[in-house]
Amino acid sequence: MSGMGIAILCIVRTKIYRITISFDYSTLMSPFFLFLMMPTTLKDGYRMNSQVNEDAIGINLDLSLPTHISPTTGSESASGSNASTLRNDGNALDGGLLRTSAAISAPTGTSQPTETIGEKLSNEERVNSNVSASNSTTAGTGRMLSQSLTNDSPSNEISTDQLKIFQRMDEMSARMIEMEESFNKLSNKIAEQNTMVLNLKQDNYKVMNKLNILLKLVAQPSARPSTNNAQNKLAIELLNSISAVSSAYLQKMQNNGSGRQHTADLCTGDSNTHSGINQHRTTNGTIDVNTNTAQLNNQFSNALNTILPDQQHNRNNVSQNINQSLPNRQLGPVINTQANQNQSQVLIHNTNTHQQVNRSPISFPNASTDKPFKLNPNGIKRRRRNTQSNNNASTNDHASAAQKPISALSPLTNSHNSTTSMNYTNSSIHSGVTSASNSFHDLNSLNNFGTTTALSLPSLALDNASFPPNQNVIPPIINNTQQPLSFSQLINQDSTTSELLPSGKSGVNTNIVNRNRASTLPSYPKPMTVKSNVDDDGYQEDDDDDGDDEGDGRDNEEDSTAEEDEVDDEIETDMKNASINKRRRSLHHKKSNSLNGRRKLHGESATKPNINSDLHYRILKAPTDVKTIWEEYDTGIRGKPSIKHLEAKYGNKWRLNKNKKTFSRRKRLYKFILNGMERGKTAQEMIETLENKRLYKDDEDGEVKKRTIGWLQESLAGI
């Protein structure tokens, strides 16, 4: 037990002194306190002889106020029991305090203080003092000590050390509170920063996901627009337009031909033909294909027998008989699926006609069906000259050519060597029908749509014949699974088929126009009358009218395109114009170069002006960009007149011979830009649209390249 204290009240001469003694358990058990607890021994025999100051009582205790606390090493009692405070109404004692040399030590040294106290007591006995005063004082002191031990509470006074300790503890408490607050603030900041870090991580994750998505989109190669879709769309639109025209035409022909059935039956002159016709009409088109083919072969044989003896006098009658002897063209000679099955019947029914055909002085053009059509995979339109056999096919003038028998008979009369010419295929008949316009050799794939057969048969009397066709026509529907036509095939067949559509009862299409005879090509031994379809704004969509044919696909370099265009467009009408243009080209080769490094050919002389120089203007060949083409059309290049000015001033006269094919291709670009300008866009925007359409990404090396102007013109063929 530490920290125990005893308050001793000392009464000296009416002054009360309170002595506070701090001690521990070891001090309490010392002989000194035992001595204090025994007042009777002092009363009986002991006398104190010391001189006591009136202001102090010597009780052999160190009661002075300590100025410094020096703790004893290894002892807890020495550090806490040396402080005693003596006060007298706030004033210090006058005579000083008696100090004893005895120090209260640890419990291990209790014997030594006992001896010292005994010696001092023996010395005090020798002092001469008043016995009564000594006894009374001693007795009073003992009573006060006993009363203080029993009645007094612990001291209310606080020592300086305790005060310092309390102050230090208050400071430490304040510091601890401040540290706690700081720690709380720090923990809150850490929590906030942790939350912020988590939010930033989430935001970063979201942003990274978005960036990854964008990078994937950017890294993916730009999907080129599929040309097949555009081709299919164009094919569907083309066939829809053809079907609409053909449906209206066939409906009209059926209505007009319903009143002529009786007359057609009377003009045939063949009982077997009458029975076949009646059977077909009663069964609503369910006649057998083999029987119908045999009947048609007999009819053609009779027609040939009628034609061969006297062609010039009997041509009109024979043509009328042939048209009337074909009452039902639904299952005519254009049936392709039954061609091989009916070949033997064709040979049987036409055995007697081969010698007559060989004796025929008429020369029909070859309709070869063995030549396959190869489409250029790049979609660039290529043209070839007709073969020498086609050049030698016709030797008469325009008048005799207009009066020739129908070209549909050419598959029957085209055989001088074998019987294979009697094979009735759709391609051979159709190529014979459309040989004047030089269309494709093989059009079997159009049977998928059921319109070509219906349109090819009425054209038998429209190409060169002078008599109206039989208008009793029922449109057939033949499902033949052939390979569909390509992009450029459908364009040309649209133009070719539209030439064969008559309008009204006259049997002549009002859209078919005869071009100027000066536009016929002098390179052929026989001049050819050119027919073409003219659209609403007056330019020819099909420019195969100068005897060119689709050839094998070649490379789509601009050089080859430019060479073919120049060869096709620079054919002169006579040798004089050819020599003049040759001199002009040589002069321009020496003086000027084109924008793309190629030398251009112009019709204007470099030495002297020509009055009709505008009529001899040549369109710029093989330009590298759309802007140059538009400048040539709108404002003109290098002082030359613009194409728009030439069209407004001369019409089509300036492009009859040289520029007709090039202009027909360029017209697609002109129309595209003009249509955009009508919708509120500028010419520059439309030019940029066309230039962007040329861009594509190469699959091999991944480079972005530009397609040719020829490809761009072909892609706008539907405009």
Swiss-Prot record:
Q: Where is the composition biased (Basic and acidic residues)?
A: 117-127
Phenotypic consequence of S360A: Impairs HOT1 phosphorylation
Q: Carries keyword Phosphoprotein?
A: yes
PTM-bearing positions, type Phosphoserine: S146, S153
One GO cellular component term: nucleus
User: What terms describe the molecular function in GO for this protein?
Assistant: DNA-binding transcription factor activity, RNA polymerase II-specific; RNA polymerase II cis-regulatory region sequence-specific DNA binding; RNA polymerase II general transcription initiation factor activity
Region annotation (Disordered) ranges: 68-90, 102-159, 353-402, 496-610
Q: What is the effect of changing S153A?
A: Impairs HOT1 phosphorylation
The answer to whether UniProt assigns keyword Transferase to this entry is no
Instruction: Give the free-text PTM comment from the record.
Output: Hyperphosphorylated during acute stress.
Q: Where is the composition biased (Polar residues)?
A: 68-88, 144-159, 353-369, 387-398, 496-522
Check the record and name the InterPro entries matching this protein.
HOT1, TF_GCR1-like
Swiss-Prot/TrEMBL GO biological process terms: cellular response to osmotic stress; positive regulation of ribosomal protein gene transcription by RNA polymerase II; positive regulation of transcription by RNA polymerase II; RNA polymerase II preinitiation complex assembly
Where do Basic residues bias regions lie? 581-601
Q: Its biological function? A: Required for a complete transcriptional response to osmotic stress, through recruitment of HOG1 followed by pol II recruitment to the promoters of GPD1 and other HOG-dependent genes.
Give the UniProt family note. Answer: Belongs to the HOT1 family.
Q: What else is known?
A: Present with 149 molecules/cell in log phase SD medium.
The protein here is known as High-osmolarity-induced transcription protein 1
Tell me what organism the protein belongs to: Saccharomyces cerevisiae (strain ATCC 204508 / S288c) (Baker's yeast)
